[in-house]
Amino acid sequence: MSGQFTSQAAQRPRSATILIVEDDMDIGVFLQQAIDEETPYQTTVVSDGPHALEKAQQLHPCLLLLDYRLPGMNGLEIYDRLQQMEETRGIPAIMMSAHLPIEELKPRGIYPLYKPMDIGNVIRMITHALAPFEQKRSPESAWIV
């Protein structure tokens, strides 16, 4: 497994990047295609923690979509490491798994997303998680005092 791939749809000019961290490439491709089709966001998929840390520093994504159970380091460990770095601190995150440690997600402000996933719920969760980001980017918000 190469550790990362980017869809052709993600190569067109888009507004911002969602970093998907998922070791099951079938799920990664499914999420990437759905997000590319249903949102204005570019997506990049990586399959493990080291690639996630590297790509997050390079891309400065607007959102992290993290699988909880990953080889080597879990999604929470990735999130915590990114929060320790100034350039990636504060990136909102959605954590995916069949079994999530809700008591650890809540204090971090991480949104829970249970597998198996309904793509409609995934898109709604992304929209909700990115509402503050979109509000800041909106030209109208520059005029709000």
Q: Where are each of the predicted segments found?
A:
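Non-catalytic signal-transmission and effector/linker regions of two-component phosphorelay proteins
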Residues: 1-19, 120-145
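Two-component/phosphorelay signaling modules centered on CheY-like receiver
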Residues: 24-44
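Acidic, metal-coordinating helix/loop segments flanking the phosphotransfer/catalytic sites
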Residues: 45-63
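Acidic catalytic/metal-coordinating carboxylates
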Residues: 48, 74-80
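Active-site residues of response regulator receiver
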Residues: 66-67
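The feature encodes the CheY-like receiver
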Residues: 71, 89
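Hydrophobic/aromatic residues positioned on beta-strands within the core alpha/beta folds
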Residues: 94-96
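A Lys-centered signature of the CheY-like receiver
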Residues: 115
